[in-house]
């Protein structure tokens, strides 16, 4: 059967023994960890445009708010040269819990940070941070060793060089950590357009793929035109009754 005719799919809420979303990220088991997205560290990022990096991080924060995912942030020496966290995170995810550190490079070395993660009761961690090769990799490796499922969002993270980023991704793969992208996370968590908040998801796609915003605008305009035509026809029919 085709989707148009109502085939069984994840959109129906019907489970399948093979596929059907079971291998994808489960929102109900997920925590978003945003690590050291700080003004000073941004200045040495070379493997991605910082403007796009910030947009991807902001999108993840907005996505977490939309889907009611726990968000945990932390920063490395924010009063020193690393600088403050990017304000867009707090603006986009006001429910985020911030865990201060006492100089630990690896957030997983901070007992309060680990305790905060464990207290969510969730076992899937989506991590992003600056630098990828340090601030993401170190806690990702430790969390994986502690039994968590870990995803590293590479384009919501940044490194001083392409080489640093590539070697980090290789190490992730060796350790069983899943390298992913902001748009992949967005799609995995959304799953279907058949939902009441679909318009909000369309806005998020525009952040990670700016040209997609034009697609959404075009579709919205087409819907408005179609709705207006229907209303005109209904009014004409009513007038002749």
List each language-model region with its residue ranges.
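Acidic, metal-coordinating catalytic cores used for nucleic-acid/nucleotide bond scission
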Residues: 78-80, 104-107, 132-136, 161
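A contiguous pocket-lining binding segment that forms or flanks enzyme active sites
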Residues: 124-182
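Well-ordered alpha-helical segments embedded in enzymatic catalytic cores
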Residues: 56-59, 112, 135
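Glycine-rich oxoanion-binding loops at beta->alpha junctions
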Residues: 98-119
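A short acidic, amphipathic alpha-helical/loop segment
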Residues: 85-88, 112, 138-142
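Short acidic/histidine-rich motifs immediately flanking catalytic phosphotransfer sites
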Residues: 29, 121-123
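Active-site acidic carboxylates
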Residues: 2-103, 149, 166-170, 177, ...
């Amino acid at each position: 059967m085709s989707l148009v005719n109502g085939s069984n799919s994840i959109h129906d809420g019907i489970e399948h023994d093979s596929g059907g979303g079971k291998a994808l990220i489960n929102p109900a088991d997920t925590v978003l960890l945003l690590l050291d997205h700080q003004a000073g560290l941004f200045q040495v990022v070379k493997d991605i445009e910082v403007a796009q990096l910030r947009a991807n991080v902001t999108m993840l924060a907005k996505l977490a708010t939309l889907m009611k995912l726990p968000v945990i942030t932390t920063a490395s020496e924010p009063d020193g040269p690393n600088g403050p966290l990017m304000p867009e995170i707090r603006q986009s995810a006001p429910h985020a819990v911030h865990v201060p550190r006492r100089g630990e490079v690896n957030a997983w070395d901070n007992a309060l940070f680990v305790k905060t993660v464990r207290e969510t009761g969730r076992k899937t961690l989506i991590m992003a941070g600056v630098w990828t090769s340090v601030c993401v990799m170190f806690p990702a490796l430790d969390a994986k060793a502690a039994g968590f499922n870990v995803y590293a969002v590479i384009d919501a993270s940044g490194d001083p060089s392409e080489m640093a980023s590539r070697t980090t991704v290789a190490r992730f793969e060796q350790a069983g950590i899943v390298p992913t992208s902001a748009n992949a996370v967005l799609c995995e968590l959304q799953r279907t357009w058949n939902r009441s908040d679909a318009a909000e998801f369309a806005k998020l796609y525009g952040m990670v793929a700016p040209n997609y915003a034009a697609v959404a605008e075009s579709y919205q305009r087409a819907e408005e035109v179609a709705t207006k035509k229907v209303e005109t026809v209904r009014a004409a029919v009513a007038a002749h009754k």
